[in-house]
Structure formats: structure tokens, C-alpha cells
A protein has these predicted regions:
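Divalent metal-dependent catalytic cores for phosphoryl transfer on phosphate-bearing substrates
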Residues: 17-25, 42-160, 203-209
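Solvent-exposed, charged/polar functional surfaces in cytosolic regulatory/catalytic domains
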Residues: 40-43, 169
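Amphipathic, Lys/Arg-enriched alpha-helical patches that create a basic surface
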Residues: 157-158, 162-170
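Short N-terminal signal/transit or membrane-insertion segments
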Residues: 2-3, 65-73, 174-180
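Charged phosphate-binding loop/patch that engages nucleotide di/tri-phosphates or the phosphate backbone
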Residues: 169-212
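A short, charge-rich alpha-helical start-of-domain segment used by transcription regulators
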Residues: 28-33
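Generic N-terminal amphipathic, Lys/Arg-enriched alpha-helix
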Residues: 2-27
């Protein structure tokens, strides 16, 4: 069932049918994660004065394509780069948007947040920021409590920390960073023209919840 949302007064708050679709599309453990992301995204949005109903909706829908086979992800979201082709899981945000649009979901703010949660917000959509931060820091992951706490008082700083940490972590291990993530990274105010960030932290990667 949908996690309690006592303060929402918005058409998007009526999500029972979509909640059931998500529950049927993902594994039980993933569904629990989805509900935690939706709840945290809603709380972050409320604290920042952002549309919390849209944040909840995007959190609920963000992983609807996460458990699809690689062949289906590639069909729904044609690769944009070599990383997509080698690691189709990176496509599950774009694939989710495609599915939702086909099923009649039409809110562009929510759809963009769903699409961007795997690679990073493209800017100009605060709901995307809420969902991205909530996804990497929801309590069930067991990591990034500092990002979660920061998000409830300074979303912009939390988003910067999450993206910088992810890029630093991947680059430190010689792993190629997705072009969309790099665009989000270089758009951050804290990133210099040479791509460096003073004292950049690394984002811990939980063992039981592989990074998307």
C-alpha cells in the first residue's frame, strides 16, 4: 500500500492505481525501497517548499522499469552511448519514462524526475533533485545519512554532495561516468572549470542495493 501522506492536497496524491502497477512490476524488496524513496522525496520537498505531491509521485514511479530484462530496457530506451550498451541497467530511468508515457502518465515534471534519477538532474526541475537525493540516501540503503539529513535543510548542497561523491567514487576506480551524469556534475556551482572540487567526498556504495 502507499505510504502515509497526511498533508497532501493535490490531484497527483491519488496514486493507488499507479502504486499497484509498481508493486506488480518490481520485486518485493525493490517495492519497499520505492516506498522509502517516495516518502523521503516527499519530506525533502516539503522542507524545501517544493511540490511534495509530485515528489512523492516521482519517487513512487522511479524504479518501475528497474527489474525488466536488459533486452526490454534496450528496446524501450535506445542506447545513447557505449555505457548504455554495455550496462543497460543505466537505461531504466529512461525506460520507465517511456512506459509511463505509453500508459498515459502525462505530467512532464514527474516524468523528467523519473528519467533523470539514474544519471542526475539536468537542472531546472527541483522535483528531480528531491528524487535523486532520496534514491541515494533513503534509510534502507544503510549509507549516506549525512546527505539525507543535509537534504532536509539544504537540498542544493545535498544534491551537490551526492553527485560529486558519485563521480569521485567512479573516477577513483577507473569506471567511466555516464555523459548525462557528467553534464549534471559540471553544471554544479561547486565544480571548477577543470572539473575539480576541493575535498570532494566519495559516495559509499551499499552492497545489498547495487547502484543503478
Amino acid at each position: 500500500m502507499i505510504a502515509e501522506r497526511p498533508d497532501l492536497r493535490h490531484p497527483l496524491a491519488d496514486l493507488a492505481d499507479w502504486d499497484e502497477r509498481v508493486r506488480l512490476m518490481v520485486r518485493p524488496r525493490r517495492y519497499d525501497h520505492v516506498l522509502r524513496v517516495a516518502d523521503l522525496a516527499c519530506r525533502i520537498a516539503r522542507a524545501a517548499g517544493i511540490d511534495e505531491a509530485r515528489a512523492y509521485a516521482a519517487g513512487l514511479l522511479h524504479d518501475i522499469a528497474r527489474d525488466l530484462p536488459d533486452t526490454e530496457l534496450l528496446r524501450l530506451a535506445p542506447p545513447e552511448c557505449a555505457i548504455d550498451l554495455a550496462h543497460p541497467l543505466a537505461l531504466h530511468g529512461r525506460a520507465a519514462r517511456t512506459l509511463l508515457e505509453r500508459w498515459g502518465y502525462a505530467d512532464p515534471v514527474v516524468l523528467e524526475a523519473v528519467e533523470d534519477h539514474t544519471t542526475g538532474p539536468r537542472g531546472g526541475n527541483p522535483v528531480s533533485a528531491c528524487v535523486y537525493v532520496a534514491d541515494v540516501s533513503e534509510p534502507g540503503r544503510g549509507v549516506n545519512e549525512d546527505i539525507r539529513e543535509l537534504a532536509l535543510c539544504d537540498l542544493e548542497a545535498a544534491l551537490s554532495r551526492a553527485i560529486v561523491s558519485k563521480v569521485t567514487y567512479l573516477q577513483g576506480r577507473g569506471i567511466r561516468v555516464h555523459p548525462r551524469t557528467l553534464r549534471s556534475y559540471h553544471a554544479l556551482p561547486c565544480v571548477g572549470q577543470d572539473g575539480s572540487v576541493p575535498d570532494a567526498p566519495r559516495l559509499p556504495q551499499p552492497d545489498r542495493h547495487p547502484a543503478p
